[in-house]
Amino acid sequence: MRVIRSLALAASLFAAGPALAAGSAPTPPDARFGFAGFFGTFDRGALQRGFQVYKEVCAACHAMRQLSYRNLLEIGLSEAQVREIAAQFQVTDGPNDEGQMFERPARLSDRFRRPFPNEQAARAANNGAYPPDLSVMVKARPDGANYLYALLTGYVDPPPGVEVMEGMHYNAWFPGHQIAMPNILNPDGVEYADGTPATVEQQARDVTTFLAWAAEPELEQRRRMGVQVLIFLAILGGLVYATKRKVWADVKH
């Protein structure tokens, strides 16, 4: 139920409100992600870089409450690395023996820490805008990965004659072209441990890959199972056909 509620919330926030996003945005171009297509898979290096972008840039405003720290084991990080990452965050636990809530370092089993305790605090810190949870954001609309990549790289100067409202920012791909979120990606805004140049396009591609995985972490397993089922059905079909030919071989038509 929480996943369904998150999808509904993400979809409502992804769509533009009447006052802020009248009109429609053009269809985003195909970013040619490696996980797209029937045989697509997630690149572990891109996932780890994408998590770094989320952690260092996006997590200041956006939660991912559908993920626990232990899920980071699935993107190729070691248990020691994940424990170190989790321990950087304080979470509320309790009550203790005295009936008091207390703060402690996060564990593998804890969900990602939220940047704000509630919606009101989030809006107060963001000029009234509510940063949506990103757990299933890529699934919130059709072609979500391509749209999100285009959105993150779509901050440009407004065309002549276009007036941008106070507190809004012009984006070529957002419906209505005016969005409350500022351009958060800057060249070399993060320093990748593997030496990959941290261009805006690379950061956008990596964090989109991470968010696509977060929205559907079972994607690779499901596709492998689909291939296995197709192979099984092909073999079964061949056996059934061969059996039919043998059983009916002596029957005259």
Name each model feature, range by range.
Residues 27-52, 63-82, 195, 215, ...:
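Electrostatic cytochrome c docking/interface patches
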Residues 16-18:
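N-terminal signal peptide c-region/cleavage motif recognized by signal peptidases
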Residues 90-178:
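Membrane-proximal low-complexity regions enriched in glycine and acidic/polar residues
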Residues 173-175, 180-216:
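Extended, hydrophilic extramembrane loops/domains of integral membrane proteins
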Residues 222-225, 231-253:
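Juxtamembrane interface at the cytosolic side of transmembrane helices
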Residues 54-65, 207:
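The canonical Cys-X-X-Cys-His
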Residues 1-11:
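Bacterial N-terminal signal peptides that target proteins for export
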